Each structure stands twice: as structure tokens, then as C-alpha cells.
């Protein structure tokens, strides 16, 4: 598999990086260009942190009955700690409150696309835990390998794309492009 990715996928990812280099108008991409996709700036969410959560509620309500119930439970039980505040620890992750069989999401919304990534990626992890928490086989919910866990979170990122304008307005397609390029760049690294 690694040889196949090296032979076919790495050249594809290299072409994608070259197009990004040209779009940015730089001579070469360096490590500090890794998170930059557009010369005029990467897309940022159009709403407040509370509006981002409410857009997430709308998206998950329309996505499926199961995701609606999941997200409403997360909101109603206050299982998001995502608003920035003084002296709050950095980072973003999903964990569990196993005594209650519920997921919990911690992050620091800061007005970047990462805020929306919490609503898609971390909620992908959280939804997986939500649907499997009562499964008696611990490997199905608590002891996932990283590769397995990332299937749920990265898939949810793509499932969310039809609703991305809720978060980015007219910059929705810029976000889609940035997200796809980021996902493509991850394949050689993640393999």
C-alpha cells in the first residue's frame, strides 16, 4: 500500500501543492505555508461562536434523525466547552464521560475555520461514541485504533459539506477547496 501511494498518490499531492504555490504567488512552499491556502486569506466562519453551534444544530437536524438526536443531546446537556476564556487550556478534542455514556467536546473557538472543524471532525468522533457507547464490546467504542477513529471524524467532515454555507456563506467553496487539499495532503502523511 505504501509503495502504491508513493508511486501514484504522492505525485498527485505534489501537483496539488504546486497549484497552491502558484495561487499564493510564492517561489516555493515552506513549512510556514502549510496552513495557508488563499492569498487573500483562508475562509473564516461568518457567525459568532454561538451561531456556529446553532448552525451545527441545523446541519445535524437535517442530516439524519440520529445526528439530530445526538447534537441536540450535546447542546441540551451542555457537552460542548468550546468558547474561549481567559486562562483556558489550549487544544481541541473529544473525550467521554463514561459514567453517563456521553461524549464531551473541548475546544477554543477563535474565529477561524478550525471552529467549524470542531463541529464536523470532533463531532464525528463524538457521534461514533454516542452510537456505540452501550455496545458491550469495549473495542467498538473505547479502544479504537487511531486509523479507525479517524474514519468516523474525517467522514463526518465530508458528510457536512452540503451544509458548509451555513458556516462560511459565500466562502463555502473556498472552504471546500481548502478542506479537500488538506485531506489529500494527509494521505501520504497518514499512511
Predicted regions and their residues:
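Cation-handling catalytic/transport regions enriched in His/Asp/Glu
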Residues: 1-191
Amino acid at each position: 500500500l505504501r509503495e502504491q501511494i508513493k508511486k501514484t498518490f504522492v505525485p498527485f499531492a505534489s501537483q496539488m501543492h504546486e497549484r497552491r504555490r502558484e495561487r499564493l504567488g510564492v517561489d516555493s512552499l515552506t513549512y510556514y505555508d502549510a496552513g495557508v491556502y488563499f492569498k487573500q486569506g483562508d475562509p473564516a466562519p461568518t457567525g459568532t461562536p454561538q451561531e456556529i453551534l446553532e448552525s451545527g444544530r441545523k446541519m445535524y437536524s437535517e442530516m439524519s434523525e440520529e445526528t439530530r438526536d445526538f447534537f441536540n443531546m450535546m447542546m441540551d446537556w451542555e457537552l460542548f466547552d468550546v468558547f474561549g476564556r481567559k486562562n483556558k487550556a489550549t487544544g481541541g478534542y473529544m473525550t467521554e464521560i463514561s459514567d453517563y455514556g456521553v461524549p464531551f467536546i473541548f475546544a477554543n473557538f477563535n474565529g477561524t475555520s478550525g471552529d467549524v472543524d470542531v463541529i464536523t471532525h470532533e463531532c464525528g468522533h463524538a457521534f461514533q461514541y454516542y452510537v456505540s457507547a452501550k455496545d458491550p464490546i469495549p473495542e467498538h467504542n473505547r479502544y479504537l485504533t487511531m486509523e479507525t477513529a479517524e474514519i468516523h471524524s474525517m467522514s463526518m467532515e465530508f458528510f457536512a459539506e452540503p451544509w458548509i454555507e451555513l458556516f462560511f456563506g459565500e466562502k463555502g467553496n473556498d472552504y471546500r477547496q481548502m478542506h479537500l487539499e488538506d485531506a489529500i495532503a494527509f494521505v501520504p502523511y497518514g499512511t
